Amino acid sequence: GGFVHQVQWGGKSPFETVNGQMPVGFDNYLNVVFGKLNPKGQNLPDFESTNRIGNHLGSVDLGLEIDTYGATLLMYRQSLVEDGSLFYLSNLMDGLNGLKIKRKNSYGADFEINEFLLEFFYSKSQGGDKFIEGDGKARGKDDYFNHVQVRDGWSYYNRTIGIPVISPTTETSWRWP
């Protein structure tokens, strides 16, 4: 198990910034690394002075591996971390669940299956349908992999990094469900 934390920060953006520049500098870097809420960094727009600097996301990973004579079984769960809703347990249903079975013995048949992987990804909860600042029970509308300042979301050349079933907002239409 473990905790994975990634952040996009710095650079330029025309959205919610000061003169198009996103916060930079060592003080802001420390605020990014520690995910400090309401930071007191330099050159902060209103959005980040009441939030966190950068586009944070990650996962809490849990796994259990069972080693038997004939196979190794791996069961795992990755819970999504986006805006604090996991801290308040409001998006517990969202995440990736997996089961992997790997056979240890091969019998030399012309065709045999040595590994089997089954995964189920769910993201419909999003922590609920309301986001109210300061209310731990209303930390919804997670909108995974998207961000106010970084409008193309968690992407590289317009392709989402991480989970391919979630598209950045630049690739979607408001008319679609």
Question: Which residues make up each language-model segment?
Answer:
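Outer-membrane beta-barrel pore domains
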Residues: 45-177
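Aromatic- and glycine-enriched pocket-lining scaffold segments that form the walls
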Residues: 1-49, 53-69, 73-76
